[in-house]
Amino acid sequence: MFKPGYSEAKKPKITDEFSYKQT
């Protein structure tokens, strides 16, 4: 699942990327 911040930034932040991989 893509996080809101992921879509807005279009670039996964370190924390966002980690959460993305966890989901």
Curated annotation (Swiss-Prot):
Primary location group: cytoplasm
Position of the signal peptide: none
Assigned GO CC terms: cytoplasm; nucleus
Tissue: During early embryogenesis expression is initially detected at the early cleavage stages in the nucleus of two discrete cells. Subsequently, expression is abundant in the cytoplasm of the newly formed pole cells. Male-specific expression during the third larval instar.
UniProt keyword terms in alphabetical order: Cytoplasm, Nucleus
Protein's cellular compartments: Cytoplasm; Nucleus
Superkingdom field: Eukaryota
Keyword Iron: no
Other remarks in the entry: Mst40 sequences are organized as a tandemly arrayed 1.4 kb repeat unit. The repeat is conserved in all D.melanogaster strains examined but absent from other Drosophila species.
Name recorded for this polypeptide: Protein male-specific 40
Protein's organism: Drosophila melanogaster
